[in-house]
Amino acid sequence: TIPKPMIEIGGKPMLWHIMNLYARYNHKNFYVALGYKGEVIKKYFSKISKGWNVNFIDTGQKTMTGGRVKRLQKFIGDETCMLTYGDGLANINLDSLLDFHKRHGKLVTVTAVRPPARFGAIQIKGDKVTSFKEKSHLEEGWINGGFFIIEPKFFSFIDGDDAYLEREPLEQAVSEGEFFAYKHNGFWQCMDTKRDKDNLEEIYLKGAPWEK
């Protein structure tokens, strides 16, 4: 088995496609939080010569999502950080996302997308997130698309290795009015199942929307 971000779509790992999206918007300085089979990711991206500066941070085998983000703090310092998972592809305009984040001036922006169902649900009033639930069986509304922007102060919301990003840290951001949603109505698809992979391969062959 290989880590999910290394599953290939169109002959390239998911993580490569995600980084390529950022690079097209001139974001080429990457910090990859390594966990399960992190050496596979490190080996592949150590050979990439696209002008990307890829830094590998071993965040531990059993560290939770919030803990992994917390461990990146000393490398990111006091800069605004763009953060994403390694299992979703989208045609998000990252310039617009960053502009939106700067305009509202809060600690966290999440990209909200329309489901294919079965994901964490977000309730939004205006642009402000009023509720964030990790999982939902609702078939409408907005879900967490996984493309975040965070300010340095947000790291203080994360207790340690056992923290789930999607629970206390983001729920605290909601309760303090520091969590806003950028609504993305374009293409978004995550890859959780073999069916998702087959679907993404089919989309790729027709002309990958995340590359346009």
Q: Where would I find each of the regions flagged by the language model?
A:
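Short alpha-helical oligomerization interface
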Residues: 1-5
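Conserved N-terminal catalytic core of the sugar/cofactor nucleotidyltransferase
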Residues: 7-8, 12-85, 94-96, 157, ...
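Solvent-exposed alpha-helix faces
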Residues: 19-20, 102, 106
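Catalytic-core segments of class I nucleotidyltransferases/pyrophosphorylases
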Residues: 80-82, 89, 95-102, 115-117, ...
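A short, conserved acidic/glycine-rich loop-to-beta-strand motif
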Residues: 104-114
